Amino acid sequence: KVSGIDEKKFTVPPVAEPKLELLISKNQSEGRLTYHDDFGKVADKDVLWITMDTPVNDDDKPDTKIVFDLLEKSLPFMKQNILIVVSSQLPVGTSKKIIEFIKVRRAGLKFDYVYSPENLRLGNAVNCFFNPERVVVGTGSADAFVKMKEIFAELNCPILKMSAESAEVAKHALNAFLATSLTFAYDISDVCEKTGADILDVKKALISDSRIGAKAYLDPSLGFSGGTLGRDLNAILDIMKESSVALPVIASVLKKNTDRKNLVTVVLNREFGSLRGRLITIIGATYKAGTPTLRRSLPMEVKKMLEGHGASVKIFDVRAEGDFSKDPYEAAVGADAILA
């Protein structure tokens, strides 16, 4: 049985996900899932699982304060021999701080700690959870690993045991690798732009190679957004900066992504001479397809850039909440350019 602690008393998930509301409703009606706003409900639980999304600021810097706040509210009620699992995104080194925090704030508490980073994707979170390619369990406790294997027993995938620090770095490395793949695609796209080649044809050749593969992140977009990839890149850079270790590849990935987002204004200014007084229509407002969230979405960042150059912007999106056109034809009326 699962009890969710939810201070805001949400009756629906804060982010819409396919199948999620149905899954919640089914398990509530069958008595396996309850929600409370009382941290005292932790008292009889064998496992405390912290899953809050770690917020990032406008510079993609992560803030783990929410994780420590939740721990502090829960600690007085934890029973002995509890298993504490964190799946929120943590900069490497945070698990060590969490363990020390618990020992100081609740001296005498017997507990095991696991860092098991989530690997969900907005718009496909339920499917990702039930069909993972692997589960990473970062812990120094053999007992904790056995318990995690029992929890994940229904999942048909490898369960990888490692230290909490290795699990933290694995999460950073995965997103850094994906971001680096995208940055490579941006560079090749620039080559195509200057040589008359078609980046989509080049991409077909790349993904047909078994050493690269059809799932490779090679979309020649205007850059990655949403804060997820940037959060891990910045976390690695910040940690290594403290040790005076340079990471030129990862640093260049962040710079390329920033430069890439400016490409839209460069191209449109080249076409029109100036964007002042121009009407630009953007098709799609959300962070990615399949979700209504606007958090750090690329279209909204592009909108802000275009308006900064004096353009007016209309946006079409049928799912996003806000002042957006729900008719693509209406949104396109009078537009000097359409971005999709």
Question: Which residue ranges define each predicted feature?
Answer:
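Structural/interface elements that position substrates and couple domains in central-metabolism enzymes
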Residues: 1-340
